[in-house]
C-alpha cells in the first residue's frame, strides 16, 4: 500500500522554551520527505522570543506550509498539547503530533502517513508512533512494525475518532498528571500503538524537560543510538507488521 501524503492530514508541534532543541527538530522536519504536502502548525508558549523566532524562520522556507500561533499566556504542556490537537482536528481528519525534542528521521512523515492509512479502520489501534528504542541487532528490520498495548507521545499520529474518545478526559493541570499518562493508563482503553522496529524519531530532550531528571538519565532511558538516521539503508515505501515477540524493545519492558 503506497502512501498518499495529500489526504486530510496536518502536523502540529508544541514549543516552549528550548530554542536549541526547537532548531534541531525543525531543521530535521524541513528535510523530511513530503514535508511540502502537510500543513504544519507550530503552537508556542509566549515565554521565549528565541523559540518564536526559530519557529517563524521555519515558516519562511519555500517548500513548507507552516504557521506560528503564540499563546496569550503560558498554559503548560497539558493545555498546549490539547490546543495543538484540537486545532489540528478542527481542520483535519488525521494529525501527526510532535514536540520540540522529537527529531524526525527523513522518512518519518511517510511512515506516519502510511500508518494512518493502513490502520484507519482497525479500531484496536489508537495511534502510530515513530519512536522505538531499537537494539543494535534489530536495525536490519528496516520496514517492520509491531503493535503494543501502550502509548508513546514522541512523534505520534492518530485519527479524529480516536481523538474524540480521549479529549473529554484531558488533564488541565501539569502538577497533577501528564496528558500522555492519562491516555496510556486510562483513555486509550486497551487500544494499541503501532511502532517501527527501526526508529523514525529521536528523543533529544535531555535538558529542561518536565519528566527527565538529567542528561545521564536521558541517555540511559530515552536516547536511541540506533535509528533510521544512523543506520543507512534503502528507502522504504511500504512497511509490514510482524509479531511483537520479534523485538526485545517493547515499552512494557522499558517503560521510561
Per-range role (PLM):
Residues 1-98, 102-256:
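Peripheral/terminal regions associated with large enzymatic or DNA-binding modules
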Amino acid at each position: 500500500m503506497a502512501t498518499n501524503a495529500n489526504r486530510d492530514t496536518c502536523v502540529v508541534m508544541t514549543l516552549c522554551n528550548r530554542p536549541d532543541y526547537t532548531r534541531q527538530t525543525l531543521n530535521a522536519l524541513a528535510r523530511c520527505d513530503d514535508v511540502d504536502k502537510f500543513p504544519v502548525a507550530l503552537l508556542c508558549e509566549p515565554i521565549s522570543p528565541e523559540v518564536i523566532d526559530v519557529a517563524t524562520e521555519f515558516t519562511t522556507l519555500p517548500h513548507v506550509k507552516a504557521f506560528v500561533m503564540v499563546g496569550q499566556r503560558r498554559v503548560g504542556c497539558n493545555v498546549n498539547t490539547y490546543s495543538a490537537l484540537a486545532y489540528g482536528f478542527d481542520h483535519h481528519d488525521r494529525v501527526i503530533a510532535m514536540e520540540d525534542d522529537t527529531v524526525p528521521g527523513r522518512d518519518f512523515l511517510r511512515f506516519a502517513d502510511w500508518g494512518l492509512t493502513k490502520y484507519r479502520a482497525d479500531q484496536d489501534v489508537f495511534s502510530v508512533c515513530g519512536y522505538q528504542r531499537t537494539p543494535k541487532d534489530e536495525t536490519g528490520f528496516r520496514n517492520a512494525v509491531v503493535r503494543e498495548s501502550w502509548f508513546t507521545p514522541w512523534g505520534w499520529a492518530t485519527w479524529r475518532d480516536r481523538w474524540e474518545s480521549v479529549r473529554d478526559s484531558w488533564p488541565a493541570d501539569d502538577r497533577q498528571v501528564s496528558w500522555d499518562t492519562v491516555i496510556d493508563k486510562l483513555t486509550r482503553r486497551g487500544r494499541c500503538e503501532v511502532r517501527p522496529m527501526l526508529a523514525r524519531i529521536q528523543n533529544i530532550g535531555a535538558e529542561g524537560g518536565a519528566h527527565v531528571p538529567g542528561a545521564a538519565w536521558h541517555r540511559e532511558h530515552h536516547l536511541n543510538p540506533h535509528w533510521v538516521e544512523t543506520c543507512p539503508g534503502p528507502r522504504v515505501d511500504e512497511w509490514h507488521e510482524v509479531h511483537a515477540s520479534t523485538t526485545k524493545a517493547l515499552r512494557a519492558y522499558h517503560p521510561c
